[in-house]
């Protein structure tokens, strides 16, 4: 007897690695670090949340106090890579793609970002341009299915049986963290809520570039 296993209402997710030699990575990292040192808690703009501990650039790009980060070469890399990632999602129609570098985030020990989503976008990309997997804690994707709040109380054995190590069973976990390497680029739907836990001590700053992505039918 043949038995098939599928996943219902699967959330698409794409991961690729961006070659750091193809763009001015060191210059970008240096500029972000310089901006961070001027103000480690640059938490302003429409997504400025008083409880967050992060240096970010959202809605503050024109602030003359900070270095203007030169993303031109990296933008061209994204222009090539993003369609390759999106096409893996098995789409139904030709589309036009629009994206923008909407933010960069930088944090040290104690840094964190509270739960949020990019609900007005089709997808969001997170590029880990500086990340130490030995110390930095990964982005957590939050399971917002309503049953998760009581599933583990009503059926406490389920999670231990299915396990919390296999992504195919992630529906039973409150949050999911992918293993992350520096230079990886992760794309997920904009509606998928995520958060950055409080970071431990590390000599290296945790840096990400955030890309908002929209698709429109041709």
Q: Language-model segments: which ranges?
A:
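Non-catalytic surface loops within mature trypsin-like serine protease
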Residues: 20-22, 129-131, 143, 213-217
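Extracellular and organelle-lumenal recognition/adhesion modules and their flexible linkers in secreted
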Residues: 194, 199, 205-207
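Non-heme Fe(II)/2-oxoglutarate
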Residues: 1-89, 112
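Active-site region of the double-stranded beta-helix
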Residues: 69-98, 109-123, 129-133
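A short hydrophobic beta-strand segment most commonly corresponding to one strand
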Residues: 124-127, 203-218
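Short, proline-centered helix/strand-breaking motifs
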Residues: 187-192
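Residues at beta-strand starts and edge strands
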Residues: 10-12, 98, 121-123, 205-207
């Amino acid at each position: 007897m043949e038995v098939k296993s599928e996943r219902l209402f699967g959330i698409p997710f794409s991961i690729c690695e961006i070659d750091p030699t193809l763009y001015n990575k060191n210059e970008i990292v240096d500029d972000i670090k310089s901006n961070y040192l001027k103000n480690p808690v640059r938490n302003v703009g429409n997504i400025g949340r008083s409880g967050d501990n992060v240096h970010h650039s959202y809605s503050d790009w024109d602030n003359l106090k900070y270095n203007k980060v030169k993303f031109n070469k990296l933008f061209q890399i994204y222009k090539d890579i993003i369609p390759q990632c999106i096409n893996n999602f098995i789409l139904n129609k030709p589309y036009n793609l629009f994206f923008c570098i909407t933010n960069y985030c930088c944090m040290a020990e104690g840094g964190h970002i509270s739960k949020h989503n990019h609900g007005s976008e089709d997808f969001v990309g997170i590029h880990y341009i500086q990340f130490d997997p030995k110390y930095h804690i990964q982005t957590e994707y939050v399971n917002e299915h309503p049953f998760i709040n009581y599933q583990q109380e009503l059926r406490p054995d389920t999670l231990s049986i299915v396990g919390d190590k296999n992504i195919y069973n992630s529906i039973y976990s409150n949050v999911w963290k992918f293993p992350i390497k520096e230079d990886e680029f992760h794309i997920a739907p904009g509606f998928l809520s995520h958060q950055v836990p409080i970071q431990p001590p590390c000599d290296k700053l945790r840096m990400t570039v955030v890309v908002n992505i929209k698709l429109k039918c041709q």
